């Protein structure tokens, strides 16, 4: 046999999705030419098969090899792959790339080497969207090695001779839209999953004891956009059961026994929850117990066979009939498909094409010992059992419904589950082609004392499809004969009570139905989402295949539910799935769907992060707090800017256990650069807005929320600010707010006043609440008078001295005059103590209104003096700076220097023990 491909033969590289499929395709196509030869490729698991064949009358030398599922992986650039390398919010827009992982490099090399020697590339990947995406991964590799390749797509639904030969003789072009839809889904899932997973894990893992054994350091609290709505169905049903309060009800039951049997009549009202009303009606019936037959209805009823078998129905029925998990069902179905016994098991289609030769498929089953006789009857025209399958209304345009493709009485290597699933597929197919079952149903209605009761009975006249489909039953009871007007006294007439019951936990078939109805996942991925919930310990499944949430699963759903965001509901994912379907049919572009979905989910992410306390509260309901060092708990890691001190790491926003906010370098402890934010903050979150002024950048703006009691009344509590030094409003707010122990300057000199010393050495906790109406003294020595606003003012006796200077009564130092730059108070003057640790503040006009003015009013000289004092004080504060965030050898060299959010250095040491390596709030001697 000639294998060289000479004589004008076209060399054709055929690529299948799995090695077993490649072997089956090669065996089928090589039979006419007398066989094939096999050799190893670069990967020992993916062999290359060679043989001669004819396509469209043209001689071809065929080379058949395979990949093993997806050849490429989508991943973030290296600088974003480490968990602490970036703010999780950055992952919504971080660069991604698709590349061949190391463990598949051998497959890649095989494809490249073979592609260089071929003229055609024929893709035998699974004929669904996922398979089309893998096909384009193969195209990228092969076309990169040989750009002149003529690329074709083989479309098939079963690994049988007829299908494979038909596919290779009617080659098509690959569908880029299908591949784009999968690309969009992969990128959306990667970005959403990675961002929420990092957020949840870093926020909660080290903060709580999640594992009773204590070995929970490697736990990943994953979030998946399909996985979480699936968990939501389980939790929602669980909550519904927990919220159910049993309620007693009462109903009247009646029975009548005659020579023909017993009939049980039910009350038309069903039941009543009011006992008194039920007793009154029951007593009426007991007093007048004669029953009168008011109506007798006899009608023919039909029970129709099921629709042709789709993937979701296969999973649901296997779960219901055999208690097989959806994940195991798909594994067994895939093995049956690859062995050629059933058609492709991943399909949404539930109607057969008119061109399908259904009789031939039935004919293959006539030899089976269990259902062969039924198959013969089905093909017999005189039996009148044949009926074309019903149309279920779904067609994915890729594959037919699941049906048998090869006869088997049971292979020696089959497990019980292989036998059960093959039997289900065959019996389901035979049932689809059968007449419905026929029954005669009788309904009898009676009246007792004005109350209506009825009873129903059924007799099956022709079982038809029920003869082969043993999984369905259609029983009934035979009623005695009644005629209209007949009267009788009931044999029993009772008032019975019962209790309402909650719905049961979701079974796997029910869960699959919920997912299918809500559009969560696809027929090929639903089982995988369920498996992940079990693997991640978010849910458990009992022996009856019913699901319950674990404490961890319930806590996460509860946390998001408390936020008010329906991230655990199916609506968002359902919209995404609809968008991806739109990409696959060309009504929306991949870029459009990516932009819309990621923009929506990033907004949800930022909102969730801003309300992370809800997650903490929910987790605290189920889990004990961890005793691990708080430094390991990454409660909030949000990148603000590159560190200008070490030029190596990022600076990030973090909230300490005490509630304070800081911006520190990730390079700690090698780099100790830190910005202490004021303790008047109640919240802070980094936004995605970049400051256009500050460098080195990017410098992300922070959304600050101040406590109203700790800032002047005319400032907004919400402020979008920049810590890079350009934000004048933020500087004012910083200067007007107490910093507590973190912002204290060097230890006060001995010659300072006792008042000032007292302020400095007071409790760092008691000193936080700044009064914005403190005492005021003028330097002209006048006696202060307290005004209604709480200020002290001095009455001037002469106009020439009317502009007395404002003095801080705590520090006894002249105040500086500043100008507000906020929207509400732009241009308004205020007095501020020169001492950064002092919280003195007063509006200029309030001070003026509290004291009589001379005819000349305040002179300009006073303002000039204040400005000079302000400039001098500011210059004095800057004098000792020797770099940001480093320990300096300038003023107070024995202490530590930090950078305040105003951009100015802050020196200090612990005022309790004098240690320069920490401040008093973390001093081990605190409280002794």
Swiss-Prot record:
Indicate which residues the UniProt annotation says bind Mg(2+) 1: 17, 126
Q: Name the PROSITE patterns for this protein.
A: TOPO_IA_1 (PS00396), TOPO_IA_2 (PS52039), TOPRIM (PS50880), ZF_GRF (PS51999)
**Coiled coil feature spans:** none
Indicate the family of this protein. Belongs to the type IA topoisomerase family.
Name the InterPro entries on file.
Answer: Topo_IA, Topo_IA_2, Topo_IA_AS, Topo_IA_cen, Topo_IA_cen_sub1, Topo_IA_cen_sub2, Topo_IA_cen_sub3, Topo_IA_core_domain
Q: Where is this region: Interaction with DNA?
A: 222-227
Query: What is this enzyme's class at the first EC digit?
Result: isomerase
Q: Which UniProt keywords apply?
A: DNA-binding, Isomerase, Magnesium, Metal-binding, Topoisomerase, Zinc, Zinc-finger
In this chain, composition skew of type Polar residues spans: 741-765, 777-806
Entry's SUPFAM superfamilies? Prokaryotic type I DNA topoisomerase
Q: Quaternary structure per UniProt?
A: Component of the RMI complex, containing at least TOP3A and RMI1.
- Positions of disulphide bridges: none
Per the record, the gene is TOP3A
Q: Ranges for the Topo IA-type catalytic domain? A: 175-606
- Which residues are listed under the site Interaction with DNA? 83, 198, 346
- This protein's record includes keyword Zinc-finger: yes
Query: Which parts of the sequence are CCHC-type zinc fingers?
Result: 909-925
- Where the record annotates domain Toprim, the positions are 11-157
Spell out the Pfam families in the cross-references: Topoisom_bac, Toprim, Zn_ribbon_GRF
* Catalysed reactions, semicolon-separated: ATP-independent breakage of single-stranded DNA, followed by passage and rejoining
EC number, UniProt record: 5.6.2.1
User: Record's GO cellular component, any one?
Assistant: nucleus
Molecular function GO terms recorded: DNA binding; DNA topoisomerase type I (single strand cut, ATP-independent) activity; zinc ion binding
**What is the protein name for this chain?**
DNA topoisomerase 3-alpha
| Entry annotation: catalytic residues | 344 (o-(5'-phospho-dna)-tyrosine intermediate)
Q: Where are the annotated segments for Disordered?
A: 389-410, 741-806, 849-892
């Amino acid at each position: 046999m000639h294998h060289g491909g000479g004589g004008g033969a076209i060399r054709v590289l055929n690529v299948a999705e799995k090695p077993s499929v490649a072997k089956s395709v090669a065996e089928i196509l090589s039979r006419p030419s007398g066989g094939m030869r096999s050799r190893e490729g670069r990967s020992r698991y993916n062999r290359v098969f060679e043989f001669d064949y004819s396509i469209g009358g043209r001689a071809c030398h065929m080379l058949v090899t395979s990949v093993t599922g997806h050849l490429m992986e989508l991943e973030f650039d290296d600088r974003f792959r480490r968990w602490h390398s970036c703010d999780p919010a950055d992952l919504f827009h971080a660069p991604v790339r698709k590349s061949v992982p190391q463990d598949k490099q051998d497959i890649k090399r095989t494809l490249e080497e073979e592609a260089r020697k071929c003229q055609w590339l024929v893709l035998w990947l699974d004929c669904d969207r996922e398979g089309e995406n893998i096909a384009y991964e193969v195209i990228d590799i092969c076309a990169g090695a040989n750009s002149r390749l003529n690329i074709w797509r083989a479309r098939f639904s079963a690994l049988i001779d007829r299908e494979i030969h038909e596919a290779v003789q009617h080659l098509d072009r690959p569908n880029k839209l299908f591949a784009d839809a999968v690309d969009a889904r992969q990128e959306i899932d990667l970005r959403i999953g990675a961002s929420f997973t990092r957020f949840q894990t870093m926020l909660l893992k080290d903060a709580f004891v999640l594992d009773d054994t204590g070995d929970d350091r490697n736990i990943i609290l994953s979030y998946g956009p399909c996985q979480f709505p699936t968990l939501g169905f389980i939790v929602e049903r669980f909550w519904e059961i927990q919220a159910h309060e049993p309620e007693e009800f009462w109903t009247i039951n009646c029975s009548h026994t005659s020579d023909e049997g017993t009939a049980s009549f039910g009350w038309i009202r069903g039941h009543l929850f009011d006992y008194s009303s039920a007793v009154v009606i029951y007593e009426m019936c007991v007093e007048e117990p004669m029953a009168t037959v008011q109506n007798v209805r006899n009608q023919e009823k039909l029970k129709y066979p099921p629709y042709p078998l789709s993937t979701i129905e296969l999973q649901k029925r296997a779960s219901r009939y055999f208690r097989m998990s959806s994940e195991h069902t798909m594994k067994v179905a895939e093995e049956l498909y690859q062995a050629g016994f059933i058609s492709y098991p991943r399909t949404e289609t539930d109607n057969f094409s008119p061109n399908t030769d259904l009789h031939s498929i039935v004919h293959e089953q006539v030899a089976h010992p269990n259902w062969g006789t039924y198959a013969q009857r089905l093909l017999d025209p005189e039996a009148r059992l044949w009926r074309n399958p019903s149309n279920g209304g779904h067609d994915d345009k890729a594959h037919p419904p699941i049906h048998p493709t090869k006869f088997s009485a049971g292979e020696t290597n089959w497990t019980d589950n292989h036998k059960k699933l093959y039997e289900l597929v065959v019996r389901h197919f035979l049932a689809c082609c059968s007449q419905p079952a026929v029954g005669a149903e009788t309904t009898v209605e009676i009246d007792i004392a004005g109350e209506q009761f009825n009873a129903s009975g059924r007799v099956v006249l022709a079982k038809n499809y029920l003869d082969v489909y043993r999984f369905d039953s259609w029983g009934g009871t035979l009623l005695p004969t009644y005629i209209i007007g007949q009267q009788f006294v009931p044999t029993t007439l009772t008032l019975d009570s019962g209790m309402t019951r909650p719905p049961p936990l979701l079974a796997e078939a029910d869960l699959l139905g919920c997912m299918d109805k809500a559009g969560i996942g696809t027929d090929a991925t639903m089982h995988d989402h369920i498996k992940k919930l079990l693997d991640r310990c978010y849910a458990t499944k009992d022996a009856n295949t019913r699901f319950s949430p674990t404490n961890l699963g319930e806590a996460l759903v509860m946390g998001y539910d408390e936020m008010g965001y329906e991230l655990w509901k199916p609506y968002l994912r359902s919209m995404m799935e609809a968008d991806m379907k739109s990409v696959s049919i060309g009504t929306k572009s991949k870029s459009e769907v990516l932009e819309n979905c990621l923009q929506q989910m990033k907004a949800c992410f930022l909102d969730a992060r801003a309300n992370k306390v809800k997650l903490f509260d929910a987790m605290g309901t189920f889990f004990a707090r961890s005793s691990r060092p708080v430094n390991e708990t990454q409660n909030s890691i949000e990148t603000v800017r590159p560190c200008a001190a070490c030029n190596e790491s990022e600076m990030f926003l973090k909230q300490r256990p005490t509630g304070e906010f800081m911006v520190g370098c990730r390079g700690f402890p090698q780099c100790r650069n830190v910005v202490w934010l004021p303790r008047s903050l109640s919240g802070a979150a980094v936004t995605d807005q970049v400051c256009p002024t500050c460098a080195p950048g990017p410098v992300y703006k922070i959304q600050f929320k101040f406590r109203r009691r700790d800032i002047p009344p005319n400032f907004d509590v919400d402020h979008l600010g920049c810590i890079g030094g350009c934000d004048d409003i933020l500087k004012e707010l910083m200067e007007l707010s107490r910093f507590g122990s973190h912002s204290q300057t060097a230890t006060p000199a001995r010659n300072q006043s006792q008042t000032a010393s007292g302020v400095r050495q007071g409790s760092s906790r008691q000193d936080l609440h700044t009064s914005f109406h403190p005492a005021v003294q003028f330097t002209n020595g006048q006696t202060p008078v307290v005004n209604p606003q709480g200020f002290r003012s001095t009455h001037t006796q002469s106009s020439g001295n009317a502009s007395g200077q404002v003095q801080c009564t705590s520090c006894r130092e002249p105040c500086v005059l500043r100008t507000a730059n906020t929207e509400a108070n732009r241009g308004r003057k205020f007095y501020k103590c020169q001492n950064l640790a002092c919280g003195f503040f007063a509006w200029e006009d309030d001070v003026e209104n509290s004291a009589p003015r001379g005819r000349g009013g305040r002179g300009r000289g006073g303002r000039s003096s204040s400005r000079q004092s302000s400039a001098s004080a500011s210059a004095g504060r800057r004098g000792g700076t020797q770099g940001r965030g480093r320990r300096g050898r300038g003023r107070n060299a024995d202490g530590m220097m930090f950078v305040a959010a105003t951009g100015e250095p802050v020196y200090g040491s612990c005022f309790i023990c004098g240690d320069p390596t920490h401040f008093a709030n973390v001093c081990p001697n605190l409280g002794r």
